[in-house]
């Protein structure tokens, strides 16, 4: 991941922040795809790190593993990005607090972004944008229950009127 993800400094970041919480370029990279195509049909790599402008190591900060998977998926125009975690996907509410919460098996990118940004911890909000821009689906799956359907996030999900999910963040009110 470090050799493939190039950190981008933001103008307002101090030197310390340029190493500890970076963003990366994620526009499709045919040269990178060609370089990696000679290997296995599936890319499995560590997440969370990138290469800084001076060649050193930079980290992607909170949610960096999800985000690096999304960056690589977008760069490579992958068929999908899989996020394996401790729950089977995104739910209509926090299943640890609401026993009747429903697994949301299909969401569009905007719905997933809203749910992730307002408190769902299963997926970091930053990882959705690169996949949405590249039209790469995100699959969320459960490491303990791989047979479960999980959640698919893509541009083909039907958006229906009404409430899909309820989420919360302490100290924040969104109206």
How does the language model describe each region?
Residues 1-128:
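Nucleotide/pyrophosphate-binding catalytic subdomain
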Residues 42-43, 58, 138, 151, ...:
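A broad, low-specificity signal marking well-ordered, structured residues that form hydrophobic/aromatic
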Residues 64-67, 142-145, 160:
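Short, charged low-complexity intrinsically disordered segments located at boundaries
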Residues 149-175:
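A conserved regulatory-domain signal marking ACT and ACT-like small-molecule sensing domains
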